[in-house]
From Swiss-Prot:
Keywords: Ribonucleoprotein, Ribosomal protein, RNA-binding, rRNA-binding. It comes from Hyperthermus butylicus (strain DSM 5456 / JCM 9403 / PLM1-5). The gene is rpl2. Belongs to the universal ribosomal protein uL2 family. The lineage of its organism: Archaea, Thermoproteota, Thermoprotei, Desulfurococcales, Pyrodictiaceae. InterPro entries: NA-bd_OB-fold (IPR012340), Rib_uL2_dom2 (IPR014722), Ribosomal_uL2 (IPR002171), Ribosomal_uL2_arc_euk (IPR023672), Ribosomal_uL2_C (IPR022669), Ribosomal_uL2_dom3 (IPR014726), Ribosomal_uL2_RNA-bd_dom (IPR022666), Translation_prot_SH3-like_sf (IPR008991). GO terms for molecular function: rRNA binding; structural constituent of ribosome. This is Large ribosomal subunit protein uL2. The keyword Cell cycle does not apply. GO terms for biological process: cytoplasmic translation. HAMAP family: Ribosomal_uL2_A (MF_01320_A).
């Protein structure tokens, strides 16, 4: 009798393949919208094993607390401003309609008050290109140009953690602990490298499926691997 495929084990929903909420200190989002400008202080920079970016724990003068992805150059004790009259300096949070053109921003809201949805990965930033009525035009890290409402908030600066990939892993054990904080399977073994009992492509004294890898969309779960319901495979003929 064969063994279950990884996709079948993942579908079961066991803890190995689920996100680990206890690793996340808190949601990284802006506080609710307010018409006034508030000052806050960065009380700590928190390591979040569930993401590649450190979080900045900020306490406002009215007592509210929140976490956001830290900006490059942000430090403990830094005073930040949040609101429509905040200055456009590194770490401050203000509506994109009040940010000068050419400024680098991150953690941008798509709708005012949603807490920040765009440009949150390490080392990324967007650029304010201009205005179009009640919309602000921004260029995302991918190069795509997008319009967001002028009231949508963003943080001035670049997301911290840009040098994450510069440190080599050196050994497989480091990669093991790196991926243990994520709901991923590591290492990822190819089907042709498995035994026949573990995968439809496994077995034999060769690493080849030995049969076409296209499979019907209606195939049973233990067989549904490879090119699922593929219209064509390989390079397109000219």
């Amino acid at each position: 009798m064969g063994k279950r495929l990884i996709v079948q084990r993942r579908g079961k929903g066991s803890p190995l393949y689920r996100s680990r909420p206890w690793l996340h200190p808190a949601p990284a989002r802006y506080p609710p919208l307010t018409p006034v400008t508030l000052r806050g202080r960065v009380v700590e920079l928190v390591h979040d094993p569930g993401r590649w970016v450190p979080l900045a724990h900020i306490v406002l003068e009215n007592g509210d607390e929140f976490y956001i992805p830290a900006a490059e150059g942000m430090y403990v004790g830094q005073i930040i401003e949040i609101g429509p009259d905040a200055r456009p300096v590194n770490g401050n949070i203000l509506p994109v309609g009040k940010i000068p053109e050419g400024t680098q921003v991150y953690n941008i809201e798509i709708r005012p008050g949603d807490g920040g949805k765009l440009v949150r990965a390490y080392g990324t930033y967007a650029i304010i290109l201009g205005r179009s009525g009640n919309k602000t035009i921004i260029q995302l890290p991918s190069g795509k140009v997008k319009e967001v409402p002028n009231d949508a908030r963003a943080t001035i600066g670049i997301v911290a953690g840009a040098g994450r990939l510069e440190k080599p892993l050196l050994k497989a054990g480091a990669a093991y602990y790196k991926w243990s904080a994520k709901p991923h399977v590591w290492p990822r073994v190819r089907g042709v490298a498995m035994n026949a009992v573990n995968h439809p492509h496994g077995g034999g004294s060769h690493q080849s499926p030995s049969f076409p890898t296209t499979v019907s969309r209606n195939a049973p779960p233990g067989r549904k691997v490879g090119h699922i319901a593929a219209r064509s495979t390989g390079r397109r003929k000219r």
